[in-house]
Amino acid sequence: MSTPTISADTTAQNATSTEVREDVNKRGNIDNYIYGPDERVTTYFVREIRPCAAFSKLPVLLTNGNGMKKFGGTFTMPINASGDYLLSLTAYATLSAGTITGAGDASVVSWLPKLGHKLIKSVKLKIDGKPLVELSSSFMDMWSEFMIDSGNYEAYNNMVGGEYEFNKDRINNKSVVLPIPMYFSRDTGIALPIGAMVNNRVTVEFVFRKVTDLLVLENKPATGAGTGVVRTLTEADFSVVPTIASFEVVADFAVVTDFEIDRTSCTPHYMYMEKPVDVPATELVKPTDGTTAPDTMSFEIEHTNGIVKALFFGVRNITRPEYLDFYKVGLPRFNLGAREDVGTATVSRIGIKCNDKYRVPLLPSEHFVYTEPYHAAKRVPTTNNGLYMYSFALDLHTIDPKGSINPSNFNSNISVVLRPSETLNAATTERFEFNATVLTGYILYVENGNLRKIDNGGDFN
């Protein structure tokens, strides 16, 4: 190898396009594999326009409905066919300020983080009074951790309520914006054809939590470490009770041409839909007779009629019911005036079984909180890393199944197998439960003005 030299370069000229093209035209064996034969491929440095029928987006404000727009209430809004396709739903809520009394000098109070997820216990999109899709606050927590990309996560977190804001006795007023993660909001190609569903009544139902379920009262001493949650709040603790000052929903519709309406109404309109199904929570019961806890615990996932695209799950710490989304061993508390989260992992290894065989072997839990979301989701959780996911699909964000499984085809039940961490086994004063949500897929179609669903049974229920 020759020794490099350093010299002044005063004669070099810029290459011309003709000279560069001569280099590009030269081919070796490896170039033929990389670029392919010229007669079969072309590189276009021109923006190609994908033509479509003319349409326009139409936002519509929904304010009227039946029920109670208040804490602990249920409110149902009709979604009239203001357009041809329903693209998305976004909820806007304003909560008034409040004050508490008698909490003690060393106590502080705050709304829970991501308040929009907690305020709405569940939201149901109904067709003729039957739920088509139901989203729980637990699902919205899990979905946002994995499926809101890092570039938008901070903004999204602020929209839905942000983090804790502790005060001595005052509860701040809050405004939250919640983009409701319905399946069709990710891809307009599967927008709900509400204009064609002339024989169906479409509504959206919101179930609100009680105000006492949305606040946490913690101990914050002037010096030293705090003791965590002081007590569960009751309505008697308020001198001024917060209220839902306003609640409204914006529905985005697409309005298309008469030609497209006529053409799509000639034959049944088929489309894919996704439906999250919450698995009933199961408390982890530890032996009390002095025997050793089992090495692994298995939790059966309720069988569904549709395909299974992904699993979201975690072991929630339920020692204090105020924490609706805490999935670690060791509760947070104030220390030297700062709030500390010193929680540790609840699980060391995770596997997934179909019937009695491992579809996914017992792998380190990090595979389900880091590797899986890195490959299949939009974001790897950075703080709430007690949540886990496994995606059977290669890309969870797209609506394409891409590897989703249908347990009905092989008459199989799915089970999540957990090996508890050492800290979980040693946590004798804390209680835990297994939470899971299954993301399932179905085929919908509109025929003769009615929406129907294809699964192993027939119409949607």
UniProtKB/Swiss-Prot annotation:
Annotated Polar residues bias: 1-18
Region (Disordered) location: 1-22
Disulfide bonds, paired cysteine numbers: none
GO cellular component: viral capsid
Keyword Transmembrane: no
Pfam families: Capsid_N (PF16903), Capsid_NCLDV (PF04451)
Keyword Transferase on entry: no
Keywords tagged on the record: Capsid protein, Virion
Compartments where located: Virion
Domain of life of the organism encoding this protein: Viruses
GO MF term list: structural molecule activity
Task of the protein: Major protein of the capsid.
Name of the molecule in the record: Major capsid protein
Organism in which the protein naturally occurs: Spodoptera frugiperda ascovirus 1a
